[in-house]
Amino acid sequence: MARAKAAFYCTECGNETLKWQGRCPACGAWNTIVEQPDKDSKKKAGLPAPVGVDMRHPRLMAEVEAVDELRFHTGMNELDRVLGGGAVKGSLVLVGGAPGIGKSTLMLQICDNLCRFSSVLYVSGEESERQIKLRAQRLAIREEGLYLYSETNLDDIVAAVQGKKPDILIVDSIQTIYNGDSNSSPGSVAQVKECTMALMHVAKGLGVTVFVVGHINKEGSLAGPKVLEHMVDCVLHFEGEEHNSYRILRAAKNRFGATNEIGVFEMGDQGLIEVPNPSEAMLSGRPENMPGSCVTCVMEGVRPVLAEVQALLSPSAYGNSRRTSNGFDYNRAMMMLAVLEKRGGLALSNCDFYVNVIGGLTLNEPAADLALITALASSFRDKPVPFDLAAIGEVGLTGELRSVSAVNQRISEVRRLGFTKCLVPARSTGKIIAPAGLTLIRVSNIREAIAVLI
């Protein structure tokens, strides 16, 4: 006997149940369980089938013709890098970020570049067409080939795409679009899921490249159901600090390229400006002969980026010491503090602890461990690290230094930025080739590193 299908769902989290309940068992919200519309009664005629796909019969893999995905350049090298060499025709790209970070500005500047050789339909559910044009004029966006449409109804948007047949569709934002066949309100889990599914059919069925803007919630993750990120082809996070002009576009998912790639932009009066050399930008204005600062090199995808790690240790004036970390994983920073105290012989238990990564970068890889250890020891002893020195290496719980990946790429970037000395683990996997003018200082543990530098 076939199992009964779920007839109710939660409008907050999308959880499906067999019967009505006052409280959702998944998210705990009250009075959010509603009856699910009959799926068989929904009209699917407005959603085209994917191009070149036979939806009627299964096919042998040997019979499927393999064709390389057609890419095109967006006109922004940093965005092309994050997308894996350009946008793919018929792909669905989700761009998320905090309010005011510059998502709409990025989308308009993409329009300016793409309108030169293709037609673009810009759909906004948050601004009127007049407001979009005023903002476009401020950014000096070209008007030829760019269609503006202020609409939130999904059926009207799909009809406009089928009528205008644009090459690129931009939807700002997915939380404002609604499907009239659904009983839930715009922005709800069910609406976001259904609208994204419809846009996916538009992208695959008509071969239109779709960029969708998404909001983030208070936890910093994309608002809406988690399935939203599984449905799209690419997930891009647009990050930045409120009082910092630099913006970082990071790929969290990419079906057509590598993940963890980043693109760096600077927000100015004329919109977003690409930063082709992020290492130099992150180190601009670095003070000389100041304790508590050390430079390291991290890999963002295949791109080496130099980052300045700053640390401050000061005697605690109260009973409990304060511990804060900005841009460096808090748990890993606490681990480095404990290793330095235990294996490095420094009494840090009565000190307030502050860590900051300059430029808005977030360091998640272990290669920055040695730079943090060096900056902490420098701050504790109030002696500066040599200005022309960088530190690369992972630190274990016993205080030993371990090798990291892509060492030669990292030290080449270090030398390119004018550094003459680099602290590296004594034992590294593979042969390390030092560039001309760069001296490698090999150490086995943190005690040796502190003794050599400070």
Label every model-predicted segment.
Residues 2-12, 16-81, 88-94, 101-119, ...:
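Peripheral, non-AAA+ core regions of ATP-driven protein-machinery
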Residues 98, 125:
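P-loop (Walker A) phosphate-binding loop of NTP-binding proteins
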Residues 120-124:
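Conserved RecA-like ASCE P-loop NTPase motor core of nucleic-acid helicases/translocases
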Residues 129:
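Divalent metal-dependent catalytic cores for phosphoryl transfer on phosphate-bearing substrates
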